[in-house]
Each structure stands twice: as C-alpha cells, then as structure tokens.
C-alpha cells in the first residue's frame, strides 16, 4: 500500500482552552457482534481462513483503522487503562492466592527452612504428588516469583492483609476499566492535549514518578522499615520490646495502623517521635538519620538491602524527580521548551557536521507515537536488563538471595523482557520510518545524516560482528582441539595461556581502593569493600547456612563468554538497525516505503527480493535476541552455581572454556534433575520439558517449509472433501508467508523459553 507523508499541521488553538471533547464517541455495543468492524474488508466476514489471521494481525494496528491520529491517540490512551485493569486483576489473583492457599505465615516464621508455596493441587487423577513438603506442615507447589520476599519487604505480616490487598486491587481494576471507557466515550482528550509534551513530562516525571516515589518512601518509613526492624529482631533471636512487651513472634506484631502511632514507632526509630514536621521545617534533618540511613551493604540477618537505605533512596529519588519534572515550560512561560532545545542543538561541527542539527526532530517525535514508543522501549528494555543484574548483586527483598530458583528466575525473566522490548523498539522505529517519516522535514539534520551514512554504519557493524564471531568462537574451538589432543598447557585458561579480563577486574577493584572513610553531606561515612555490592570484592553474605551473594571472581572463562555476548549482541543490533535504516529504501528496492512495514517479497526479479521488509528484520532479530540471551542466562546460571552458591564445585573456570564443556558439564550434567523428575513433586517440569521441546520442534514446520507446499496440499484435501460433498463454506487457505513466519517465530520462542524454564526450575528445586 502507498503511504503518504503526514499533512503539515494547521495552526492549533491554545491547548488549555478546551483540552477534551465531551461525548465524543457514544458507546455502541452492536459493534461487539461484528468482528473486524474497524475495517471495511474484514467487516464483510470470512470468505477464506485468511480472514481470522488478518483479524488478529490488524486488531491493534490502530493506524490502519478508520480515523486519524487523534482517534488513534484516544484508543491508545484508553487501552492504557485497560492494561492497568488487567495488571490489577493479575495482582489481585496473586494476593488472593497468598491469602487463601499459601504458607505465607509459616514462611515468615522460618524463612530459612520453609519454602514459599501458594498453590495446592487438588487430588483429581492422582496429581497431588506435585504437592511437595515445603516445611512447616505445608504441602504445595513451590513458587519462585519472589512475592513472599517482596511482601515481607512491604511489611505484610498476615494473610488478612493480603486478602484486603486482593479486594483493593479488584476495586482498582474496576476504576481503571471505568477510566478507559470514560476517557474514550465521555471525555476524550484532543490531539493537542496529547501533543503537549512539556505538560506530559511534568505530569509523568514530577507527578507519577516523583510523588509516587515519595509516597512509597512514606510507606517504607512508616510501615516497611519498622516492620522489618521488628521481624529482623525476631529472626535474629533478639526481639525488640514495645510498651514493655517483647515482640517475639508474628502474633505479637503491632498492626500497620498502630505503627503510625508516634508513641509506638518511636520505640523502634526515635526519629519518629512525633516532631517530624517540626524537624523537617527547621531543617533538623539529622533527627531522621535512624530511619533514613546510608549504611550500604546487606543486612546480615536477611541478606538484603537495609530497609532504611531503601526508604532513603525512594525519598531522595522522589525529590529529584519532582524537581526534574518542573524543568519544562508549561503554563507559566518559564523553563525549557523541547522544541527550542532540539532546534538549537547542532552538535560539534567536526564530529557531528549535520548543518541543521536536530531541526525537525521535535516535529517527528510530537507526531509519531511509533517513534516515541521506539525510544521508550529501547530505554525500558535496557533498564530491565540492568535490573536483572541488580536483583542478585544488590538483593532488595529479605531472604531473596538464598532462594536460588527465585534469583535465577528473576534474572532470566528480566533478561527476556529486556530483549523483547529492545526488539520491539526496532519494530516501532521501522514503522515510524515508513508511516511517519517525511523526508522534506529532515534535510541535513542528524536523522537524515545517519540515513545517508547507513552503508558505512552497517558495513562496519558487519565487520565487527565477523571479527567478534570468528575470534571468540575460535578461542573455544582452539581449546576443544587442545583438550582433545591432551595439551592443557596450550589452552586458553587460568592455568594455561591466560586471557584475564583486566578492565573488568579493575572496575571490581575500584571499590577496594576506595576503602576508608569520607564525609558525605556532613556525615562520616565508612567506605568498606562491598558498600555498593558484595560482588565487587566484598565479603560473603551468608544467611541460614546458605550463601546469598559473594565476591564474583572473573577469569579467562568469563573473558571468553563475554566476547560471545558481545558477538550475539552486535549481530542482533546489526539485524535490527539494518531493518530501521533500510525501512524506506535500499539499493535492491528503492521504493520500499510504498510496500509498507510487512511484505513477503517484491517479486521474483533481481535474483530474489524476499525477507527485506522491516517486519522481516524484526523476525530475524527475535531469533538472535533469543540466541544471545540464552547464552547470557546459561552463563549466569552456571557461574552462580559454580562460583557463588557452591553447587558444582567451582567447575566453571575449567569446564566452560570448551564447547564440549558447555554440552557435557552444563546442559547434560545439569539436566539430570529434569530428566529424572518422574515420581517426584518436580515431575511437572519433566512433562513441561518434553512438551516445550515439542512446541519448539513444531515451529520448524512453519519455518522450514514455504507457503506453496501447504497450498498444494490443501488443494488435494479440498478436492477430497468436494468428492464427498463436505466442502466448507469458508475456503481453507494456507498461511501467508508472513503469517507462517510469525507463527513459527512465536512457537520457536515460546517452546525455547518454556524448555529453559523447566530446565532451570527442576535443577535448582530438585537440588533443594
């Protein structure tokens, strides 16, 4: 289809005059009886089986529906409320399971021996065997989501509070659903309201993030930290005394509203003695130093960050966000204008010689929600990957670090989410280039210059990928050959030819060299090793006889696998970036923009033109993202088991330096738990391991065969049906080339992820 550049916008009325339109679109339930009502062709109903696939492909592609950018913006905004409603329902279900079916109280009373469980299998056909003995007279399925540890950090001490949260979350879901209906049908914002970016930043940064963080700091200060102090004292065997009564068990704990009483709170933290407002406004802030701390390191009782440090963090971050949210010019005529910043930002004339700098970028971002989404997905995806590292290096929740399946699960989860978001960023960047990019607006600005330099960028990136791939894989092949020939001295290893990661070791040692003391905001702060994280040459954090986190030594094996990471990341980037930079045109297909975001081929000429669409680059990028992150999570799993948790006898340094070592000592040796799981409570992971392998193998049927093969087969099957007068009214059609690839990629990823899920869980739950 032909995509026209967006029309130049007309001079708009001041945004604050009337930002919403009342009763814009009346509620029409009759549409629910018409699948595909947004499209003239789909609304006619199915003539072939292709209809159902097009229905799924286009249901959320609001750009292609009847309507303009304002209508699209309203639909997206309304969908946000629907999304929040689904999240609240999901949270309510978690709270309800915790309240009704879990051993939360039992786990709270003995978190180092009792394992978390929140689901009990009913004995219908004998599957009650799945209910493992988790300790504390509870039999159920062990959970690895980390919610018990998180609830303990929040200050939840009984199931009644969880039930209240479950009901509250359902009420919030109802409010969110109503919000989605209200802001689409009753009070729909105008396009100018959506384009008022400075006000949006003010609302999001100062309001949602800043005030939200300060509000959460308030909860941490008044509920979370006092509860943590009392619970930690119980777990340490040194109960605190409130009003002359020792708080020796959960049953003795004050109720949350009682902790807000200064008379009780001050017995835990004297700074909460009731003069907090006076101390705040007289700047006597040192009075708060008992519940707003800067201790660093981990709480030795729980193996997690100090709750008082977390309170301090959220307060400080919230204040910064409130200030940052007011940097932009809204109704008062002061502050920054994003358009002025971008239009005036030219950059260094030698390094960045684009004559028009960032002119036109503001208009692109203010009119293309795909461009906005691309940027936001790239940033939040990267943030998710950063979070995956923080969760083990600086465990935020009590007793999280000694729950190994949960630590591995959280790392893996945040890695997958980050990877999917980053690929999604490339997808929406490609859509933005095709649907929203107007070449006339971008003449010799940074975006235009990057597009003009795309051949240099892609060819150099291709060289980097080849260099990294051949060299890093070559190190492994060399080691396999040397080990096969019995020549260990000629291997790249810590005991042979060393390839030490000197830069990474230097970063780890920075924290040691900074040890001593310094003055921070007038207070003397000790900078001991492990102040930031124990992984940086700190000390071993042990809780209940289990290692939570410890210094992580880096050597030749890490140097080698990190260069495999570099290789897979660069190849993923190469594919995704090529899909964006060549989304509109290429030497092979100069008019690519006219073909749209997804198309299978551009005809049989030129020696073949398939898999060149921006969508196909996302398709290929997903496989490399999966490939790269599989290596990352395998590396993390083995490294932690070997060098931190002490489960595999420290074999990572010598075994992971060969391909054979990865196959034999990681995949094969560690799959013994899942392969021998039958007859045990973890047997569902054995079934899942098999089933997910099947789903993965099923994907190959879609990926390895072309559409024509299946259409030929269908013709024969339809002929047979016609002979028997059983011809269907809706004509069967083979999946289109693009649809087949989408189904194949989905099953490949889901099968692979679920296989890994079963492998990891069975391994660490099976080891106990």
UniProtKB/Swiss-Prot annotation:
Catalytic activity, as annotated: reduced [plastocyanin] + hnu + oxidized [2Fe-2S]-[ferredoxin] = oxidized [plastocyanin] + reduced [2Fe-2S]-[ferredoxin]
Domain of life of the source: Bacteria
PROSITE patterns: PHOTOSYSTEM_I_PSAAB
Location of this chain's protein in the cell: Cellular thylakoid membrane
Transmembrane helix found in the keyword field: yes
Cofactor binding, note field: PSI electron transfer chain: 5 divinyl chlorophyll a, 1 divinyl chlorophyll a', 2 phylloquinones and 3 4Fe-4S clusters. PSI core antenna: 90 divinyl chlorophyll a, 22 carotenoids, 3 phospholipids and 1 galactolipid. P700 is a divinyl chlorophyll a/divinyl chlorophyll a' dimer, A0 is one or more divinyl chlorophyll a, A1 is one or both phylloquinones and FX is a shared 4Fe-4S iron-sulfur center.
Transmembrane segments: 76-99, 162-185, 201-225, 310-328, 369-392, 408-434, 456-478, 559-577, 617-638, 682-704, 742-762
UniProt-recorded name of the protein: Photosystem I P700 chlorophyll a apoprotein A1
Organism expressing this protein natively: Prochlorococcus marinus (strain NATL2A)
């Amino acid at each position: 289809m032909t995509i026209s550049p967006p029309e130049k916008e007309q001079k708009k009325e001041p945004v604050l005059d009337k930002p919403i339109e009342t009763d814009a679109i009346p509620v029409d339930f009759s549409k629910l009886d018409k699948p595909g009502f947004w499209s003239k062709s789909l609304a006619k109903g199915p003539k072939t089986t292709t209809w159902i696939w097009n229905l799924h492909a286009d249901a959320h592609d609001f750009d292609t529906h009847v309507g303009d950018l304002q209508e699209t913006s309203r639909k997206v905004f309304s969908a946000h409320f629907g999304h929040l409603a689904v999240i609240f329902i999901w949270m309510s279900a978690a709270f309800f399971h915790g309240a009704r079916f879990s051993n939360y109280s039992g786990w709270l009373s003995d978190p180092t021996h009792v394992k978390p469980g929140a689901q009990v299998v009913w004995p219908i056909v004998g599957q009650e065997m799945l209910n493992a003995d988790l300790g504390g007279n509870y039999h159920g399925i062990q959970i690895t989501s980390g919610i018990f540890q998180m609830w303990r950090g929040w200050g939840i001490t009984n199931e009644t509070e969880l039930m209240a949260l479950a009901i509250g979350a359902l009420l919030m879901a109802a409010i969110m659903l109503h919000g989605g209906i209200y802001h689409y049908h009753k009070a729909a914002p105008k396009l100018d309201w959506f384009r008022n970016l400075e006000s949006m930043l003010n609302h999001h940064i100062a309001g949602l993030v800043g005030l939200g963080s300060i509000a959460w700091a308030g909860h941490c200060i008044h509920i979370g930290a006092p509860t943590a102090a009392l619970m930690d004292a119980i777990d340490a065997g040194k109960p605190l005394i409130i009003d002359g009564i020792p708080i020796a068990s959960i049953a003795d704990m004050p109720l949350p509203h009682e902790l807000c009483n200064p008379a009780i709170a001050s017995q835990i933290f004297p700074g909460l003695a009731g003069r907090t407002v006076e101390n705040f406004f007289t700047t006597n802030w040192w009075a708060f130093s008992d519940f707003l701390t800067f201790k660093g390191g981990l709480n030795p009782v729980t193996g997690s960050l100090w709750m008082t440090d977390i309170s301090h963090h959220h307060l400080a971050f919230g204040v910064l966000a409130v200030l940052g949210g007011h940097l932009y010019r809204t109704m008062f005529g002061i502050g920054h204008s994003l358009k002025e910043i971008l239009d005036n930002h030219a950059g260094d004339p030698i390094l960045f010689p684009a004559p028009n700098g960032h002119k036109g970028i503001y208009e692109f971002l203010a009119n293309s929600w795909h461009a906005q989404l691309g940027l936001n997905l790239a940033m939040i995806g990267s943030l998710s990957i950063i979070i995956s590292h923080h969760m083990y290096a600086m465990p935020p929740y009590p007793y999280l670090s000694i729950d190994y399946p949960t630590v591995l699960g959280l790392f893996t989860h945040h890695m997958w989410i980050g990877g999917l978001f980053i690929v999604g960023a490339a997808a929406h960047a490609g859509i933005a280039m095709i649907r929203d990019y107007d070449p006339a607006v971008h003449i010799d600005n940074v975006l235009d210059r990057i597009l003009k330099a795309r051949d240099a960028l892609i060819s150099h990136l291709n060289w980097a990928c080849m260099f990294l791939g051949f060299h890093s894989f070559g190190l492994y092949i060399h080691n396999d050959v040397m080990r096969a020939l019995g020549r260990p001295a000629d291997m790249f290893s810590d005991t042979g030819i060393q390839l030490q990661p000197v830069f990474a070791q230097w970063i780890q040692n920075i924290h040691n060299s900074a040890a001593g003391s310094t003055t921070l905001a007038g207070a003397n702060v000790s900078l001991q090793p492990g102040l930031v994280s124990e992984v940086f040459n700190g000390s071993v954090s042990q809780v209940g006889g289990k290692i939570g986190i410890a210094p992580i030594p880096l050597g030749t094996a890490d140097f080698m696998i990190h260069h495999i990471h570099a290789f897979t990341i660069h190849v993923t980037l190469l594919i995704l970036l090529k899909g964006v930079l060549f989304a509109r045109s290429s030497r092979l297909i100069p008019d690519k923009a006219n073909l749209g975001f997804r198309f299978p081929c551009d005809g049989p000429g030129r020696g073949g033109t398939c898999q060149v669409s921006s969508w196909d680059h996302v398709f290929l990028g997903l496989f490399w993202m999966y490939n790269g992150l599989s290596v990352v999570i395998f590396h993390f799993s083995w490294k932690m088991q070997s060098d931190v948790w002490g489960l595999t006898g420290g074999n990572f340094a010598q075994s992971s330096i060969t391909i054979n070592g990865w196959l034999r000592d990681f995949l094969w040796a560690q799959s013994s738990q899942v392969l021998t799981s039958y007859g045990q409570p973890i047997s569902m992971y054995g079934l899942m391991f098999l089933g997910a392998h099947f789903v993965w193998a099923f994907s190959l049927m879609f990926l390895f065969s072309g559409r024509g093969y299946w259409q030929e087969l269908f013709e024969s099957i339809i002929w047979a049906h016609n002979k028997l007068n059983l011809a269907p009214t809706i004509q069967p059609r083979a999946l289109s080339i693009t649809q087949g690839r989408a189904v194949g990629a989905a099953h490949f990823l889901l099968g692979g992820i679920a296989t890994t899920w079963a492998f990891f869980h069975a391994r660490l739950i099976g080891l106990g």
